[in-house]
Amino acid sequence: MMPIKSIVTLDQLEDSEYLFRIVSTVLPHLCLDYKVCDKLKTTFVHPFDILLNNSLGSVTKQDELQAAISKLGINYLIDTTSRELKLFNVTLNAGNIDIINTPINISSETNPIINTHSFYDLPPFTQHLLNIRLTDTEYRARFIGGYIKPDGSDSMDVLAEKKYPDLNFDNTYLFNILYKDVINAPIKEFKAKIVNGVLSRQDFDNLIGVRQYITAQDRPRFDNTYNIADAARHYGVNLNTLPLPNVDLTTMPTYKHLIMFEQYFIYTYDRVDIYYNGNKMLFDDEIMNFCISMRYQSLIPRLVDFFPDIPVNNNIVLHTRDPQNAAVNVTVALPNVQFVDINRNNKFFINFFNLLAKEQRSTAIKVTKSMFWDGMDYEEYKSKNLQDMMFINSTCYVFGLYNHNNTTYCSILSDIISAEKTPIRVCLLPRVVGGKTVTNLISETLKSISSMTIREFPRKDKSIMHIGLSETGFMRFFQLLRLMADKPHETAIKEVVMAYVGIKLGDKGSPYYIRKESYQDFIYLLFASMGFKVTTRRSIMGSNNISIISIRPRVTKQYIVTTLMKTSCSKNEAEKLITSAFDLLNFMVSVSDFRDYQSYRQYRNYCPRYFYAGSPEGEETIICDSEPISILDRIDTRGIFSAYTINEMMDTDIFSPENKAFKNNLSRFIESGDITGEDIFCAMPYNILDRIITNAGTCTVSIGDMLDNITTQSDCNMTNEITDMINASLKNTISKDNNMLVSQALNSVANRSKQTIGDLRQSSCKMALLFKNLATSIYTIERIFNAKVGDDVKASMLEKYKVFTDISMSLYKDLIAMENLKAMLYIIRRSGCRIDDAQITTDDLVKSYSLIRPKILSMINYYNEMSRGYFEHMKKNLNMTDGDSVSFDDE
């Protein structure tokens, strides 16, 4: 037995292998009318991943994404300016997000349930967020994930020892921080944006405002760093005529630019002296406390809501020196004015006041409940039916929220249950493959299967499968094409057309239709001998061999005429050749007459549109052909016959060849980044499409019991019943899908029956000739010699003919019954079930014949009518006195 820990589960698989398992194991268990919840059709992707790669945002809800980007911008500014948080392990620069290798500030309150999942299929920042969420507290994960609590919902209030400021409003902070075209300056926090090659007007005005507080010695370096002179010329500003800076706090028109200097430039440039009522200020902290208090006076109560311990007073003491350099302490107290002491944490509180100011003039973000963050109540999850539960657990990462020591944590739901914890809510993260959520792909695939009744594919016009030559003429033309040497394109076309016309003139007989198996070879030989560039590509799509033949340049009547004229043919002569070779040219220009293959998305990679310089039409002729794969090529015969144990049988993928091709097609679709459910459906092999849920059979095999389980159907479609019979004989091995296998087996028996009825007809005709000669002799005796042959002699002869036909039909039935049993036993043997001890009785033969009879009923009726015709003909010629004494009775 395989150890339980070594079993590969769906959450350990990725890309095509994962999608294949979903399609082959989960999809067959869903009803075709199964409705996927709209909330599960989108997923969560960390905004950092989307900002670096816009295509990743296609699987998210746009309103949730915009809300998360706004919230994340606020949280990032709070975190990067704080002295104690430092939860983000990234640095946002112009056009890039750099990962910090130093450990982030994860709390000591780590998750007691150890996470063993890596989530390698997720984008890097989403993967990192999940690792943090399953390691640290849920509250911290929500902070660095941009979570916004929905209003009026049953979302959970997570528990945490310490909580951070929660601000919520529309903003473009992240976009501004990541704006690519900025001046490369030593100060990374202030990003001077370049618009149309010039410093933006807003940044220019702010820099001019800051510039007035920079000392004269540092001002040239400042101007050079930010190209102030160029921007001033562009905006028509004369730097030499700027007004002198106002450096007195009592008369400053605004404190904005002095605060900006403190926020961004204090450590790079020297500041001019600042005064209060003519006295020089001595301490920078007092300058900032005064400026911030005056500029953000209305926001101080809001600040206290977040930081109740911050000192707030009705006055402020400023330490200054008067013009005589004497120390003067000034106590400033203004009516209805409060002064806040930011405790020398200038950078954080300046940033936080700016956030509060932005919040005051912006609208709050409204979001709905998130399946990733808020999820659903655990009781609601448990109440879902088995089908929903199976679908969710196979297409989503399933997490659970639980409380431990007054702290909320998140872990894989199965890990929580294994740890004997009680989940409170269940959160879902739908997986993404090829740029789409798996849940959405399954929904599209189910819709495609439900809406398409037949597997359509572009096919050739079957009415044009000849070139107007008889079989003899076609073979001569075919041999001539094989002898054509390499010649210039124009010359080769002319010689082939003229050779065809020559053969056509003396050809007699009905047109020979090209066989399907030789069609592609003839196409290749015909166009290659004419000098066209012919390329062939072959692949497998579904359970069909796909052949793509491209012919360049494109074949049209006008192109042939133009080419013939290049070989010294006049236009009139070229038209005559075209007329004489009408059937050939009609065949050539009609080879690609099928439904537009470009409407089938999944075949575009096989049939790309090309454009070649020098080609009159600018494209080529495409021939697309599809042929079903034979059953022996579809199944893994080597794997089946090499399996000797039950485990080996269970591990054998019977349809390995076509499943491998299916995986390759899935990989190609995923790599394209534009996979759809229709792609999956059209690439799906028959063994998955036709799969039904079956149960294993009993421990022994009884031919009679198997045949008793089969019922006759009016439509002669025995596939489902025989599939049930076969699956009932598989003992304890894994249930396998035999729909297509049984269907082909029955068709094989039916074809064999046609051949057998032909042999029987020939034998019957030869034997009937003896009876005919006997009847002729009786006729001669009575007509010529006027002797009378008794009715008992005539009746005896007719009875013997009836016995002959009955014996012939009985032999035919036994033969067909044996053929049918042989086909079914062959399938059972392939399925891994032992049939050595099975005994076949006469009753089994009768049952076997009854099963196949609906498929060969027309042939049986034909034979009976033929025999009846002989019987009635002989009876008429015998001229019996009592004609009703003998009659021909059939089934």
From Swiss-Prot:
Residues with site note (Cleavage): 614-615, 697-698
GO CC entries: virion component
Entries under Pfam families matching the protein: Pox_P4A
Disulfide bonds: none
Propiece span(s): 615-697
Keyword Nucleotide-binding attached: no
Gene Ontology MF term list: structural molecule activity
Assigned protein family: Belongs to the orthopxvirus protein OPG136 family.
Record's function text: Core protein 4a is the most abundant virion protein. Major component of the virion core that undergoes proteolytic processing during the immature virion (IV) to mature virion (MV) transition.
Quaternary structure annotation from Swiss-Prot or TrEMBL: Interacts with P39/A4.
Protein name: Major core protein OPG136 precursor
The organism of origin for this protein: Vaccinia virus (strain Copenhagen)
